[in-house]
Amino acid sequence: PDPLAEKYSSMSPYMYCGGNPINAIDVDGRSTWVVRAGKGKYEVVGGNLYDNDRNIYVGTLDKKNNKFTREYSIGITTSITSFYYCDAKEGPKWSEESIIDVNDRSGYEFLKKIMSQIPPMIDDYMLNARTGHRYDFKVTNGTDHEIEGIDIYRGMPVGVTDKGQVIFSSARDIGNITAGFIAGVNGMPWIPSRLAFDFYQGGIEGISTRNAEFYGWQLGYYNTSATQKRDNLMNSLGSAVMSLFKSFKNKKK
């Protein structure tokens, strides 16, 4: 049995939007288009922002006429913008040429570890979620160092729905899902969490980031009892105080 599927049975990457995508995710939906790249890999070639569909479709692309012919779906995405780069410098665009690897379990293992261990929010998660640090999954892939040249929009499976559909996410989304989850599991309401994320980043975050953070926040907030959220927050505060005390003692030596 899958421990995450059991722990977060009502809403998790294993039950897309808790079985109610209209309430949890934008009603318009989004589909992502990919072509075969061999050995369980698929290359992102575009998508449709207005087709009321969140599937990842495999098909063929007529580059001359820029026409995509759909064949079948390999699953769905965690967020409406998982493979859509809303805040690219040259303007919003699909993460074309990014690879979705159905055999890559790194994102699944990363989320599984976070959700089972729940690191203290302040002196552990916030300290190590900065760019290039171990919780910055998009560039570290779950390691303790930044991996040079790694694609932040590489895709991978993170679970299945209650109907058996595979759920995929991008590496960038996985890191932001984690941020939202940590806030939610510590009992932080969404609006204060949203403001805290913007403050932490030094400005208003893009919609791609916000969508993933909200998805993660729902996982943590709605699947954790009030008592457990209080305990998680107290543990986070206690850990931060202890870290501060140790730092003060070391400076005095």
Locate each region found by the language model.
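Active-site or metal-binding loop neighborhoods of secreted/extracellular toxin and effector enzymes
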Residues: G91, V102, S193-K253
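Short turn/helix-capping motifs enriched in Asx and small/polar residues
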Residues: P1-S73, S79-C86
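Sec-exported extracytoplasmic/periplasmic mature domains
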Residues: G29, A183, G187-M188, M242-K249
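Hydrophobic alpha-helical bundle signature of multipass membrane enzymes
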Residues: I76-S208
